[in-house]
Amino acid sequence: MSYPDDRQYSKDHEWIAIESPIRVGITEFAARALDEAVYVDLPEVGSEVSAGQACGEIESVKSVSDLVAPASGKVLAVNQDVIDDPKLATDDPHEAWLYEIEVTELPELMDSAAYEAFAQEA
């Protein structure tokens, strides 16, 4: 598995792209563990999310997993394409972002090399 260098990664297997707009998604590791997503529940636009706290969920043919916010902030947009076709989240996890956020607090996260090592141990 490879992880793009332009993102930071959480221990909850989510990525955050610190660019404009700031986007959040799941990692390839999470996508493989889930298999094929069949339902995605994302935070509402305008809602506040807190780093390390559940803010939605993704349901697959195998299981249901919480989406845990990698940063705190206000949700600016959700990816309607992923809501309409949840399989996008697991088919191409590094392209299929879930939501955009205005960050108010960004905890220390891992770069791609550190996350790759972390994922190999998981």
Task: Give residue spans per PLM region.
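Acidic, low-complexity mobile loops and tails
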Residues: 1-54, 87, 91-122
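Short, solvent-exposed beta-edge and connector elements
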Residues: 34-40, 61, 69-72
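Short, Lys/Arg- and Gly-enriched loop/turn segments at beta-strand edges
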Residues: 59-68, 85-87
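Beta-solenoid/beta-rich acyl/carboxylate-transfer cores
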Residues: 48, 66, 72-74
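Short, charge-rich, low-complexity interaction segments located
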Residues: 75-91
